[in-house]
Curated annotation (Swiss-Prot):
Keyword Lipoprotein attributed: yes
GO cellular component, one term: plasma membrane
Single biological process term from Gene Ontology: cell wall organization
Pfam family, one: Abhydrolase_1
Subcellular location: Cell membrane; Secreted, Cell wall
Organism in which the protein naturally occurs: Arabidopsis thaliana
An MF annotation (GO) of this entry: hydrolase activity
UniProt membrane topology term: Lipid-anchor
Descriptive protein name: Probable lysophospholipase BODYGUARD 2
Disulphide linkage map: none
Main location: membrane
Domain AB hydrolase-1, residue spans: 193-296
Length: 471
């Protein structure tokens, strides 16, 4: 191990120990604020079910007679296999380990251990069961997952500006926001191209970069469709959603494929969007004309390792350098610190945009700020865990299906200096789909693979689509 690597890990140990303490304190801070501002202490993923207040709207599901974490009800449907275990088992923090040690010592000294056959249960766990039974909650066992019904209204810590809440006043509150660029003069498009953005981004990532730079020929032959994913940009941001893969796919199918009656289409996807693109290819194998994936987050999971946990530790290594890696780690591991970032930055994104324009004399376009800051913590936190981490066990089968059953061109682009998703991920995709072509762009990172080289990338995409037409 080099000195720089050792220093990064050593400093990271102390920094993340402090973040453990901060997140622990913020947990109780938000419970107090939620109670005063929303008249309810909503349970988080570091709380246990007994701490949740017994209300008629809540459903708590037992796991083999015990109790697990409380998560949110997925709107009208409950799909337990879509919920990543990284949400409620991200690994014990320093404070959690210490508190468990103290509780176990107290338990042994004052109450002893409760023996049941070959199972040893702590008295702390036994007391939890007593508290739940006294609360007279209605219990129901469903696929060993705990859920709780919650409200659809934005939380007090979310942004309530007209842009972020435009979906609440829309006539179609159950559809995603879609930006469409049609051929001019009402000419019928020869083909359709669907653009899917990545994590903490929006359709502006495509519409502000690629759309203006396509050639006149492409603009007259293709219909370009860029979508704001569920929870981002001007799309719905339901607070009662778990933002699972199934929900994201259903919304894309409803808002894009069904609405525009797409029989065939090309897909261009970035980062998180690559997972959704592959899932769409599996569901609609005959409709896909080409797949263009930018920085796909595909990690080969070793045998015997829990996929979601492995992917999380690869994406969000607890290191302080580089900065993007540190940011990903904070958002992944710390629920309450992530919410604080949302409270400080997301809730004030309009002020940040104004100051940015003021400091740059209005010479800097702020469309990236829209993507980075126009979402909710609930949406980004669940999407990160349920899609990027939770899909770790699914991508192998998706890629196998694309290789064997989806007859389309597969092109992969990756920045040579991408510090968030390593280039090896793209080569891993090629190892699963040998016909895929990998293009590593030197000196470009996770964002500048498009931003700053949009003209070149627009030409590269057009060549891919033309090649598809000629085959």
């Amino acid at each position: 191990m080099g000195i720089a690597r050792w220093l990064n890990r050593t400093v990271g140990f102390f920094v993340f120990a402090l973040l453990d303490i901060a997140d622990f304190l913020l947990c109780y801070t938000y419970k107090t604020l939620d109670y005063f501002l929303e008249s309810e202490r909503k349970p988080c993923y570091c709380s246990s079910p007994p701490e949740a207040k017994a209300k008629t709207e809540k459903i708590i599901v037992s796991e083999r007679g015990g109790y697990s974490k409380v998560v949110s009800l997925t709107r009208s449907k409950i799909h337990f296999d879509e919920i990543s275990d990284t949400l409620y088992s991200r690994g014990p923090s320093l404070l959690t380990r210490l508190s468990k040690l103290v509780r176990s010592v107290k338990c042994f000294n004052y109450k002893g251990l409760i023996m049941r056959g070959n199972v040893v249960e702590s008295c702390d766990h036994h007391e939890s069961k007593k508290k739940i039974s006294k609360g007279k909650k209605r219990l129901m066992t469903l696929n060993s997952t705990v859920i709780e019904k919650s409200s659809t209204a934005p939380r007090w810590s979310d942004c309530h500006c007209s842009f972020c809440t435009s979906w609440l006043t829309s006539t179609n509150r159950d559809s995603l926001f879609v930006k469409v660029q049609q051929p001019k003069d009402n000419k019928k498009a020869r083909d359709n191209v669907v653009f899917i953005h990545g994590f903490v981004s929006s359709s502006a990532f495509w519409t502000e970069t690629l759309f203006p730079n396509f050639s006149d020929s492409a603009k007259s032959n293709y219909r370009f469709i860029a979508v704001d994913l569920l929870g981002y940009g001007r799309s719905p941001k339901p607070n009662d959603s778990l933002y699972t893969l199934r929900e994201h796919l259903e919304m894309i199918e409803k808002s894009v494929i069904s609405k525009f009656k797409l029989k065939t289409f090309h897909i261009v996807a970035h980062s998180l969007g690559c997972i959704l693109a592959l899932a769409l290819a599996v569901k609609h194998p005959g409709a896909i004309k080409s797949l263009t994936l930018l920085a796909p987050p595909y990690y080969k999971v070793p045998k015997g390792v829990q996929p979601a946990q492995y992917v999380m530790r690869e994406v969000a290594r607890k290191e302080v350098w580089p900065p993007m890696q540190f940011g990903a780690s904070v958002l992944s591991w710390y629920e309450h610190l992530g919410r604080t970032i949302g409270l400080v930055l997301i809730k004030n994104h309009q002020l940040i945009e104004f100051v940015t324009r003021l400091l740059t004399l209005n010479r800097m376009r702020t469309y990236l700020i829209e993507g980075f800051l126009c979402h909710t913590h609930n949406g980004s936190f669940h999407t990160l865990h349920n899609i990027i981490f939770g899909s770790g066990a699914k991508l192998d089968s998706y890629l196998d299906h694309v290789r064997d059953h989806v007859d389309c061109d597969v092109a992969i682009f990756h920045g040579g200096k991408d510090e968030l998703i390593p280039v090896e991920c793209s080569y891993s995709v090629k190892s699963k789909v040998p016909r895929a072509t990998v293009h590593v762009i030197p000196d470009k990172d996770h964002i500048t693979i498009v931003v700053g080289r949009q003209k070149d990338f627009a030409r590269e995409l057009e060549l891919i689509w033309q090649r598809t037409k000629s085959t």
